Every structure is written in C-alpha cells, then in structure tokens.
Amino acid sequence: MTDSTRSLRNCLAPAKLNLFLHITGRRPNGYHDLQSVFQLLNWGDTLHFTRRDDGRVARVTDVPGVPEESDLVVRAANLLKAHTDTAHGVDIEIDKILPMGAGLGGGSSDAATTLLALNRLWQLDLPRAELQSLAVKLGADVPFFIFGKNAFAEGIGEELAEVELPTRWFLVVTPRVHVPTAEIFSDELLTRDTKPVTIADFLAQQTSDAEWPDSFGRNDMQEVVTRKYAEVAQVVKWLYDVTPARMTGSGASVFAAFHSKHEAEAAKAKLPASWNGAVAESLNEHPLFAFAS
C-alpha cells in the first residue's frame, strides 16, 4: 500500500469466509439471528483513493452491473462525508476480482475499506466504534470488516468477539452462478432453529484432530442453495472428493482448507475450466486495521 497526503493506493478489501453459519432464529422484522465465525483472507479487491478538493465523490472505474449511485463504495464515502461534514471529496478506483453473489463479502469489504481509508485520507480520526456504527447502515457484514479481526459473530452479524485462528491455506471455488442472498433467507425450507453454540465450543474444535471444517457445525444455507443451484452442488461434491468442504455465506463460493499453499495449488490445478478457483492464505488482521483506533 502507498500512502501520501493526497492519495492512498493499493488498499486491499479482503474477502471473508464463514467457517460455519448457523441460523438460530428469526426476528419479527424479518431479520435472522445467526452465529458464525468470520475468517479474513489475504485476497480481495484492491481500491485506490485520491483526495479531491471540490467535495465531490466519484467512482472513476466501471464496475459491470453496479451503477455508481448504488455502489456500496460510493454510498460509504457519501455517508462518511455527511456524518463528518468534511469539505473533502475523493476519486475511487476499484480493481474488482471478487465475484459478486458469492458469499465472500466483496461489496461489504469494499465499503469498509473505503470508510477506513477515508478516515485516514480525510484526516478524520474517527474511532473504530463510530465507524462500525456507520457501517451498520451499509449492510450487516460491513461492521465485521471495520472490526478488523477474525471474529465469532452473533445477532444479525454485528455482535463480534475476536477469535484466534490457526494459519491455513484455502482453495475457494466459485461456479458461474449468482446466488441472491434474499432469495435464500426467504426460502421456507431454510433451517431457522439451530441450537446456539458458544465460542468455547468452537475453539475446542480448533485443537482437535477431527476433519475440518466437518468437525464443527455446518452452513445452514448450504442445503437450500445446493437444492436450487446445481452448479453449487457440483462444486461441493467435487471438492469433497479431495477434502472436506463447505459453502461460505449464502453461496455460491465453496471452500476447503489445506496445510500448505502447495496442496491448495495442486487441488486448484485439477479444477474444471468453467469454475473460478483462488488460493488464499488466512489473515489475522485487516490490512487497514491501524486506520482506526
């Protein structure tokens, strides 16, 4: 990352994985209570920010299928600008590599990186808690990326507690299908009454010799998604022939863990050509963590 008084270049917006995802209830307002562990990855979109003195917020790169006015990156910048009444503006460039509708948190991570980067570039010095309260307005996953550590999540995903996770290499496989999150959450067959677990339950599994991630929990959305989307079911089956695997978020991406980069790359080399595969190492901390206190 390059840092100057007028620009911030090469700011990573890391992907996340849901190591498990349990839905424990549904609220009267339609939101779902969940439990999950969010894992940061050293892989994601890259954003570049150049300060403007005319107060305008502009996305200067095209993102296919995402109009500028509805882009979470632009919305995040405008939200922060309105909250602080700063006179500054910004040009935002996005090198987009994370697939959309994949359960990797791409748009949410882009928004969080924008809030963190502009907190530094605009010299706002807002505390992390204040940025997290703004982030909730942009989406349920955005506060996690501001939190900036691997986390045990509860509530709708906004109640976060840091967890220490071992270093792992992951193969993340995404078929060419977009899975709308709202469609999966509204499915009548979705499990919504999984028994709550504790952080201690999860951490005890981390030191066991059982196969991982099969050794703890599940993704309650996976059964619904694989029933609706044959492409996702095919990825799960293919990966299971290699090693235990699990869908992240509401899909469509599926991940498997490996002890080394070499093992993950070897599995990736065998993927069908129609699937997008990426090898990524786990992260313990968001790359822009120091941009808020």
UniProtKB/Swiss-Prot annotation:
Q: What is this protein called?
A: 4-diphosphocytidyl-2-C-methyl-D-erythritol kinase
Similarity comment: family membership: Belongs to the GHMP kinase family. IspE subfamily.
Molecular function terms, GO-annotated: 4-(cytidine 5'-diphospho)-2-C-methyl-D-erythritol kinase activity; ATP binding
Report the top EC class in one word: transferase
* Catalysed reactions, semicolon-separated: 4-CDP-2-C-methyl-D-erythritol + ATP = 4-CDP-2-C-methyl-D-erythritol 2-phosphate + ADP + H(+)
The record places the active site at: 16, 141
- Source organism per entry reads Burkholderia cenocepacia (strain HI2424)
What NCBIfam families does the entry give?
ispE, PRK14608.1
Read off the Gene3D superfamilies from this record: 3.30.230.10, GHMP kinase, C-terminal domain (3.30.70.890)
Q: EC annotation? A: 2.7.1.148
What HAMAP family does this protein's entry cite?
Answer: IspE
Q: What gene does the UniProt entry assign to this protein?
A: ispE
The entry marks the following residues as binding ATP, namely 99-109
Q: Does the keyword RNA-binding apply?
A: no
Q: Which UniProt keywords apply?
A: ATP-binding, Isoprene biosynthesis, Kinase, Nucleotide-binding, Transferase
By its UniProt entry, which InterPro entries does this protein fall under?
Answer: GHMP_kinase_C_dom, GHMP_kinase_C_sf, GHMP_kinase_N_dom, IspE, Ribosomal_Su5_D2-typ_SF, Ribsml_uS5_D2-typ_fold_subgr
Q: In which pathway does it act?
A: Isoprenoid biosynthesis; isopentenyl diphosphate biosynthesis via DXP pathway; isopentenyl diphosphate from 1-deoxy-D-xylulose 5-phosphate: step 3/6
**GO biological process annotation, one example:** isopentenyl diphosphate biosynthetic process, methylerythritol 4-phosphate pathway
Q: Does the keyword rRNA-binding apply?
A: no
Transmembrane spans = none
What is the role of this chain? Catalyzes the phosphorylation of the position 2 hydroxy group of 4-diphosphocytidyl-2C-methyl-D-erythritol.
